[in-house]
A protein has these predicted regions:
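Glycine-rich phosphate-binding loops of nucleotide-dependent enzymes
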Residues: 2-241
Length: 241
């Protein structure tokens, strides 16, 4: 499924994933064009997180294909996918609490030479100054919003071409949600391709070039972000309108 004129950096075709005997994805297909921000919205249990984890290699696909930059990575290891340019910001942030902010960031650069990691960390500090101010502080003592910034920064340390964001606004106050989405838009403007999973459908579709709606492990709607925002079915099901 092609979302536009730009060639897809990520192409998922008829993807199926199981947890034991339980099927979580039922033939999902989607494309993420190079340089775009694509939002994936849907209710809890729709399969959004499972899809991201299957793309990143945390979960194994039962069938279907995942192509990245024209290469089939369906059976590639998670480590190889990171080295190829895919980074994921997991749901719930998952920072290493006892470790310092800077050590958490450096963990994200394990595939990069030290000199590149040092340049990357300065870029992260410029993007999120609060992290630099707390660079020696244990990550577990940060606020929820600061931990989300740290989680995003850690993923960026790998210098990804594709950033997978899983529920970045979860549990955050409205002001912090706005800050996180401002950062996401800035990353997209820098040319990083983003696949954003978000239950806050209005926030996600407002910034997305394209969007998909996932229901019970299947993609059921696709369109430009602004068009999905105006769609009556999306309004009723996900926007509370």
């Amino acid at each position: 499924m092609n979302t536009g004129e730009a060639a897809p950096l990520l192409d998922v075709a008829d993807l199926r994933t199981h947890y034991g005997r339980i099927q979580a994805l039922h033939g999902v297909s989607l494309s993420v064009p190079q340089g775009s921000l694509v939002a994936l919205v849907g209710a809890n249990g729709a399969g959004k997180t499972t899809l991201l984890r299957t793309i990143s290699g945390v979960h194994r696909a039962s069938s279907g294909t995942i192509s990245f930059d024209g290469r089939d990575i369906t059976r590639a290891s998670a480590d190889l996918r990171v080295r190829s340019g895919i980074s994921q910001v997991p749901e719930g942030r998952q920072v290493f609490g006892p470790m310092s902010v800077e050590d958490n960031l450096m963990l994200g650069a394990y595939t990069r030479p030290l000199a590149e990691a040092q340049r990357s960390i300065e870029r992260i500090y410029a993007m999120f100054p609060v992290l630099e101010a707390r660079r020696v502080q244990p990550a577990g003592t940060l606020s929820g919003g600061q931990q989300q910034m740290l989680s995003i920064g850690r993923a960026l340390m790998a210098q990804p071409r594709l950033l997978l964001l899983d529920e970045p606004s979860m549990g955050l106050a409205p002001q912090l949600v706005a800050e996180i989405f401002t950062a996401i838009v800035a990353l997209a403007r820098e040319g990083i391709t983003i696949l954003l999973v978000e239950q806050n459908a209005h926030a996600a579709l407002s910034v997305a070039d394209f969007g998909y709606v996932l229901e019970i492990g299947q993609t059921v709607m696709f369109g430009r972000g602004r068009d999905l925002l105006a769609d009556e079915r999306v309004k009723q099901a996900y926007l509370g309108m």
